[in-house]
Structure formats: structure tokens, C-alpha cells
Amino acid sequence: MSNKGQLLQGPFLNALRKEHVPVSIYLVNGIKLQGNIESFDQYVVLLRNTVTQMVYKHAISTVVPARAVNFRVDDAAEA
């Protein structure tokens, strides 16, 4: 994955985690998962609803927050 991709992903997912924003995660096979982001790393996202699911990032198509989220990306990443 490119460095720019990481610079966007990290702050976005971290804002969702810190603010406990409910999300819908759509997988590449069309399945929709819902919950709150508990944690994440380079390869996986932990999604908590009634149970905690480990979702591999390569299987994720789209992350849709339930509300708007402000997150800051370093100016260097906006090139």
C-alpha cells in the first residue's frame, strides 16, 4: 500500500474509533457489517457490535460513518 494511502487511512479510522462513531463496512463481496471500530492496524480492523469481528482490510470496499467526522491529515499528504 502506498504511503499516502496510509496517511489517509490512519487519521480517518482513528477519528472514528476515538469518537465512537457507528460505521457500516461494505466488503468486496457485498456483505454489509455494522458496528464501532475498536482498533486497527496495517492489515485488519476490529469491528465491535454484539461481538468483536476481525475484518481484513483487503476485504473492505467501503467504510461509511453514521455521521460526518473531522480528521486532520498532514499538509504533506495533500499533494
Swiss-Prot record:
RNA chaperone that binds small regulatory RNA (sRNAs) and mRNAs to facilitate mRNA translational regulation in response to envelope stress, environmental stress and changes in metabolite concentrations. Also binds with high specificity to tRNAs. Coiled coil: none annotated. Residues 10-69 form the Sm domain. This is RNA-binding protein Hfq. It comes from Cupriavidus necator (strain ATCC 17699 / DSM 428 / KCTC 22496 / NCIMB 10442 / H16 / Stanier 337) (Ralstonia eutropha). PANTHER family: RNA-BINDING PROTEIN HFQ. Belongs to the Hfq family. The keyword Iron-sulfur does not apply. PROSITE patterns: SM.
